[in-house]
Every structure is written in structure tokens, then in C-alpha cells.
């Protein structure tokens, strides 16, 4: 499909279309070239995207939850907030009860790794979060997040915590090797550690 807002190509198979008691399955490959996502979803913060992906999805029903499995996702161009990101890859599983995935970006102005998992307990409605990220280099001015001039950051972070149905957080979040750079110089902030726990009726951060 080619249009004034870019092109898209899909090779997709559908399963269980006429069987109402089974979830609909979708599998295949999708490729876009300069497809203006922002115009499609009416969002000014997003623009053209050039990508390739191979995925499988299940459109759930009352007996089967929805799920998306991304086997490969390679983004050559993604315009977001008026900046063209490049060289992004991702894999992962997304469902109504969780997420488990990995994202790597080697853009000239944003180099980072994110790997994490999220799970929601259907019984207690408690959510478990566990992730690690390493931002090797982020030029916040170049990617239009800081308009004041030179603004660069480097850090790593990890987290392992549970969020209860009441909103309480229990676990730890560690942010380390924080280094900031602006027009006045470079600043090594060091490490920040947050620990939260509860005992009886006491909640401590």
C-alpha cells in the first residue's frame, strides 16, 4: 500500500476467524517506509516510521487473554518529538497481565539498553516490576527534550519491586553512575538508592 503518508507492506495470516469460541490469531511480517504514524493516530508528537517486524498476536476473549509476541522489530527511522531516531531493535511479549522484553537503541544521540519484565497477579492485583537499563549516552538537547542548550546524561538503573493494589511500593530501585553535562561543565552525581518495605502497619521508604 502506497499513499501520501508513506507505504506499508504486510504478509499476514489469520486463524479462527469464524470460530467464536477460539481467540483470533494473527501472525506475519509487516514493513513500513516513511509511514506517518502521527497522521494515522492524530498525534503531533509522532511522525514517519520506517521499520520491519515479525510478530504473532492473539486477540483474546473471556477465556483467553490477548497477547502479542514480537519476534523481531527493527526501526530504521522513527520521528518522535520532531527528532528522527534510528537503529532501534526490540523483542518481547506483551499481554494483558504482563510484559517481558528488551529494547536496544544505537542512535547517535541516544545509546541505551532496556530489559525488563512486568507481571500482574489476577488474584491479588499486585504488580511485580523488574528491569535494568543502561543509558550510555543521551543528548537531551539533540532529541528535543531540553531546549536550554547542551544537556547530556549517562546513567544505569535497576529495579525490583512490587506495587500493591492499594498503591504501596515494596522493593528497591538503584540508579548509579549518574553523570550530567551542560554548558558549565560535567557533574558526577554518584548513586541513588531507594528501598521501600512494610512491617505490620508501618510503611517505610
Regions found by a protein language model. Give the residues of each.
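Interface amphipathic segments
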Residues: 1-205
Amino acid at each position: 500500500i502506497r499513499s501520501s503518508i508513506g507505504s506499508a507492506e504486510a504478509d499476514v495470516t489469520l486463524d479462527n476467524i469464524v470460530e467464536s469460541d477460539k481467540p483470533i490469531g494473527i501472525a506475519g511480517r509487516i514493513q513500513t517506509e516513511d509511514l506517518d504514524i502521527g497522521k494515522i493516530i492524530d498525534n503531533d508528537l509522532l511522525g514517519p516510521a520506517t521499520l520491519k517486524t515479525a510478530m504473532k498476536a492473539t486477540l483474546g476473549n473471556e477465556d483467553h487473554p490477548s497477547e502479542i509476541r514480537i519476534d523481531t522489530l527493527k526501526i530504521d527511522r522513527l520521528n518522535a518529538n520532531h527528532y528522527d531516531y534510528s537503529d532501534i531493535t526490540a523483542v518481547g511479549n506483551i499481554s494483558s497481565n504482563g510484559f517481558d522484553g528488551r529494547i536496544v537503541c544505537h542512535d547517535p544521540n541516544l545509546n541505551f539498553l532496556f530489559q525488563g519484565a512486568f507481571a500482574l497477579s489476577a488474584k491479588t492485583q499486585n504488580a511485580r516490576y523488574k528491569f535494568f537499563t543502561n543509558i550510555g549516552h543521551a543528548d537531551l538537547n539533540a532529541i528535543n527534550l531540553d531546549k536550554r542548550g547542551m544537556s547530556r546524561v549517562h546513567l544505569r538503573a535497576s529495579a525490583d519491586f512490587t506495587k500493591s493494589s492499594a498503591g504501596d511500593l515494596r522493593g528497591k530501585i538503584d540508579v548509579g553512575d549518574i553523570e550530567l553535562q551542560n554548558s558549565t561543565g560535567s557533574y558526577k552525581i554518584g548513586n541513588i538508592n531507594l528501598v521501600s518495605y512494610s512491617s505490620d502497619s508501618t510503611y517505610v521508604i
